[in-house]
Each structure stands twice: as C-alpha cells, then as structure tokens.
Amino acid sequence: MIHNGMVTYLFDFDGTLVDSTEAVEKALRIAIEKTIPAVIESDLYDDYYKALFLFIKGKLTYQYLGVIHELVAQGTIHEYYKLMPRYIKDFPHARRVIRELRARGRRVISFSGEHTYPGGKVIFMKKTDWYDEFDEVITFRGTKDMLKKFQTLREFYPDEPFVWVDDSPSRFTYILDENTLLVQKASPYKSDVALLFERQNFLKIKSLREILEIDEGLSAFAGGDKT
C-alpha cells in the first residue's frame, strides 16, 4: 500500500534511462582497434574483446587476467571509458520525464550500480550531461551495498512513498518495503521475475512516458497533493 507524502523517485541509469548496450559493443571494438591494432585480424581479437567485456561488467575470470594486464598496459581500458559516453543514447522521453517530475516538485534520485572502474558511473553521467538532471546521484556496488543505501534513504524519508524504476527486476526481489512502488521498465535483455507480478506494489511498463501517468495517479490517490 502506497501511503501519502512527497514522492521520491529512484531511477536506474543504464538500460532504464539510456541505451548503453550498443555503446558498449562499439566502444569496446574501437578501443581495441585504436590501442592494439595488431590484433584486429588475428585469432586473439575475440579473447581481447571478451576479456574487456567481462572486466567492465565486473565478471572477469582468472582465465583472462593476463589479457587484462596487457589491455591496461596498452591503455585500452582508459580508451574505452573515454569513448563510451559518445555512443550512449537516451531512451525516448527519458529527459522529459525526469524534468517534468522535478517540475512537479518530486525528488528524483539516480540510483544505480557502479561501474567496475571506480567513479565510472558519475563520469559517464557528467559526460552525457545527465548528472545535473537529478536531485542526487547514488551508486552501489552489488546487492548488499544496494540494500544498505536503500535503507539509508528510507531512514532519511521514513514516511514518503518511493517509486523505483529499473530494467533489472531481480533487484526488486530483495525489497520488502510496502511504501515503495516497484516499476520494471521492459527490456529485451532482462527476464521477468514471475513472483513479482503477484505483488500489489509492482508494475511493468513499456515506455517511460507511463511514469508521468503513474505520478498523476499517485497524486490523485494522495488527495490531489501536487507537492
């Protein structure tokens, strides 16, 4: 049950507000080509690409440690993080929705997983002119840190309804807070979690525009309070 109060919105970034999937693939390829051109036509290219991909996803295995050491030495990883923001694209309506929510007096927080590169998420946000769109930017390292930071937010705003928008519904399975509306943004890269559809405080949307309709519904439910 969502209770009355000023609404706080928590938005994931990659996959929710911006489409970074193609950007990752393009930046990886160009970074390797620019820093280690000798491997482009060799059998090593696939290993270099996979090692770099696993590294930035935080899933590097021992098998690729040697390759990563070379990628660091050649400046490939640095080049990737320099290139990546150029290719990130906003999802339709993303900025308009964020700006409209803030214009309505809502608190809008970026709440997303940190990149493997420390501070990488904030760097990306600043280079894509997203950082200042939010009232606050919070990043977390894994599930335990996510839950800790969510709890800290709840302690700051104990009586206010939260709306958490994310393309990764698996994160929602850890959240038992009944004053948080969990909104899954549909993504071709993420699977549904069947159990969530049984919860009253869960919704799935196709377009970010639907957030504005949800906000209007919450305002009406709260007695027309628009602040």
For every predicted segment, state its role.
Residues 1-46:
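Active-site neighborhood of HAD-like aspartate-dependent phosphohydrolases
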Residues 109-163, 173-177:
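Substrate-recognition "cap/lid" segment bordering the active-site pocket of phosphatases
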Residues 37, 47-83, 100:
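A metal-dependent, Asp-based hydrolase signature
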Residues 82-110, 147:
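Short, acidic loop-to-helix structural element flanking the phosphoryl-transfer center
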Residues 125-141, 196-215:
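Structural recognition of alpha->loop->beta junctions
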Residues 149-156, 211-224:
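Short amphipathic alpha-helix with an adjacent loop that forms part of the alpha/beta core around
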Residues 12-13, 111, 165, 183:
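Short hydrophobic segments within beta-strands
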